[in-house]
Amino acid sequence: MSKKRLYEIAKELGKESKEVVARAKELGLDVKSHSSSVEEAVAAKIAASFKPAAAPKVEAKPAAPKVSAEKKAEKSEPAKPAVAKEEAKPAEPVAPKTEKVAAKPQSRNFKAEREARAKEQAERRKQNKGNNRDQQQNGNRQKNDGRNGGKQGQSNRDNRRFNDQAKKQQGQQKRRNERRQQEDKRSNQVAPRIDFKARAAALKAEQNAEYARSSEERFKQYQAAKEALAQANKRKEPEEIFEEAAKLAEQAQQVQAVVEVVPEKKEPAVDTRRKKQARPDKNRDDYDHEEDGPRKQQKNRSSQNQVRNQKNSNWNNNKKNKKGNNKNNRNQTPKPVTERKFHELPTEFEYTDGMTVAEIAKRIKREPAEIVKKLFMMGVMATQNQSLDGETIELLMVDYGIEAKQKVEVDNADIERFFVEDGYLNEDELVERPPVVTIMGHVDHGKTTLLDTLRNSRVATGEAGGITQHIGAYQIVENGKKITFLDTPGHAAFTSMRARGASVTDITILVVAADDGVMPQTIEAINHSKAANVPIIVAINKIDKPGANPERVIGELAEHGVMSTAWGGDSEFVEISAKFNQNIEELLETVLLVAEIQELKADPTVRAIGTVIEARLDKGKGAVATLLVQQGTLNVQDPIVVGNTFGRVRAMTNDLGRRVKVAGPSTPVSITGLNEAPMAGDHFAVYEDEKSARAAGEERAKRALMKQRQATQRVSLENLFDTLKAGELKSVNVIIKADVQGSVEALSASLQKIDVEGVKVTIVHSAVGAINESDVTLAEASNAFIVGFNVRPTPQARQQAEADDVEIRLHSIIYKVIEEMEEAMKGMLDPEFEEKVIGEAVIRETFKVSKVGTIGGFMVINGKVARDSKVRVIRDGVVIYDGELASLKHYKDDVKEVTNGREGGLMIDGYNDIKMDDVIEAYVMEEIKR
């Protein structure tokens, strides 16, 4: 008979599939889902159950349809013995079965059930073993019969074996199906399947109904309270409105509490939650084993159901807790909806380039999405984290009606701004300041002697080699007025120091010896002063010498643009003798006169700014810097930034070595307290606090490092040849240590200017201070030697230098350092050799000796032929071979040389093609001194 699926029956009746499934279960049918199939008679029975007329019949005889349907199903499958056993049992009515589904399951004796199942499995396993043994004996018997039968019965045996295997497989499949049907019936009887979808739908409908009832009650209460509040607040003050609103809210809460205390009576709901059912495990038997090995075991459906039941139970528990929490939340009074505050737009907006949309939105108190939309309408695609340029920000502010102003950001690390800002100085606080005078001129023209005379001390006698090594800053008093003097070196190596002195000075005193006249450094000093736009006072010194000629000096200076006022120029000329203190007062009066004409003024009320004159490292004090205060007043404990360093002024000393606490404009002082020694010529400035000074100093150091890295020379087509050529040069590595920063600069510049073809100077390291162990370690690693200028090595450094074979050269005069370095560079060059011919000889006879070679008998016709000389073989005026002698003999004796007019024999190394009348030219290579 044909079968029908439940969803087909539902489609014919116009019902939903789940209704048909539920009706089939009510009729006692074992169906699982809408895709389950039933016989046509059962389908007709299900269809008839939906008709009103058929309903009484079903109630009168509930068990009759099921019994008939089961009998029909059993007749359709007569081969199943398990079904036949079921026929013998009395038919159970359907109604009691449906009652079991709704009722609570009774307690079971699981221990007794497990023991019974174990006994059944043991008996079945024993029976299967006997069957397998009989089958094995039959198989062995068949094999023996096949072997005895011969070739003729081979096909018959194969057919019988195939039939036996087929029967065996059919029997196993039959027993397997019977067991499965028994297990399914047993599981259905113990725990019938539950329609979880129907139960979940019922539970959800019940919860929705409960929530709708409670929500409707709360909504009505809220509407009533709102209407009452609106009527009462028509003509009341805001304070009264808020008080009454609070009272009404309390009343609403009380009403809600009463509603919760006295809930309405409802019929108890049927517990539709899924119960955890204990299903028996599947019987494991030996039917899944065959001769070729065990088969893959079937999945344990019971254990899967247990896991699924446990998950659903946990989900229900969590859902229950969540529903309870929501119920508590529903009982609370709803929070009033707060209206969004309206912020007025500012009238002005100060912006900087690179502001993001989010920053602008925060400043004008608008949402970023609103600004993004406006920008989109303006044709600008942007996100809230995107930076905008100044023009876009201005257009955006115009759209909002806000006046946009660009914020001028001040670079806190820029010291130079203090020197150029117009508003830094107070015009009302300006006072007259002392002039800063720089004494410049050629070496040994008497600059330091003049300054010594001015200070009434003997500083000049202490200068090594008669030249000043670094700038000296001093202050004297003349006619109650202070004058600050700077003494600059006159040697050619100190060009940078003279330029630095001219840049901070107000007046330049150009010292020219009356007997020497204008010299190279004199011209250089003139150029520095003109570049700095500084007036020049010419002091013609050494007029006491017999060969003095001041007129010649005036004429030579006029050729270089320094004209005397007597000749219509603007430079004052004073003839002096610094050694004998002649006309010194007149020179000082001239200085004060020129300073008065310049009207030099400063503001002592502002924070101090100025220039570094000199810097050095002291063993006990650390970094020591000589500063010239140009504006403001410098105090002890001031936070200060000097060049790329920073610190706090711990101590100040004047030019006399006395400690001072205050330094006004045009005052030279030495300070301590910096973290590093600055560079001479750097500017300094005092900051408000140490935090800002530290930030500015660190930022300046970072910028200097980045600038140094970016200054690395890159190879291009223009400098490719120079780069390749520099790679072929030899290098002299030098480490320079000096007493002051100015000497380090001068020495480094002078050494790098030394021009020796093929050799260059590489300054590995240069610093201020004594030679220490780290300098020796660096020299050893870089294969360099150390030059100490006015410094000495520490005892530990000296011992380490001797152990590591590092050369240390100490000097106090700069031109001696330059001469010594030039000699060292020339010694680095490869020696040059010149060829010198020492003699000639003619081959008179040749002798060929086996295993030796060709011997040439010769006579010296000019000079001599030496054993260690090189020879050329010349034939018909052409050089045939150039090489060395293998042996030289006079008759049978080995000799070192054969002189003119004598005969001998020779062999040439690597050459045997000597012929008669060949000319042998002997020569040597001599080294040429550079």
UniProtKB/Swiss-Prot annotation:
Residues 50-67, 129-141, 309-318 have a biased composition (Low complexity). PROSITE patterns: G_TR_2 (PS51722), IF2 (PS01176). Residues 577-579 are annotated as: G5. This is Translation initiation factor IF-2. Residues 487-490 are annotated as: G3. Signal peptide: none annotated. GTP binds at residues 441-448, 487-491, 541-544. It is found in: Cytoplasm. InterPro entries: EF-G-like_DII, IF2_II, IF2_N, P-loop_NTPase, Small_GTP-bd, T_Tr_GTP-bd_dom, TF_IF2_bacterial-like, TIF_IF2. Residues 50-217, 260-346 are annotated as: Disordered. Gene3D superfamilies: 1.10.10.2480, P-loop containing nucleotide triphosphate hydrolases (3.40.50.300), Translation factors (2.40.30.10), Translation initiation factor IF- 2, domain 3 (3.40.50.10050). Residues 68-90, 110-125, 157-167, 262-295, 337-346 have a biased composition (Basic and acidic residues). It comes from the Bacteria. Residues 541-544 are annotated as: G4. Belongs to the TRAFAC class translation factor GTPase superfamily. Classic translation factor GTPase family. IF-2 subfamily. Residues 432-599 form the tr-type G domain. CDD domains: IF2_eIF5B, IF2_mtIF2_II, mtIF2_IVc.
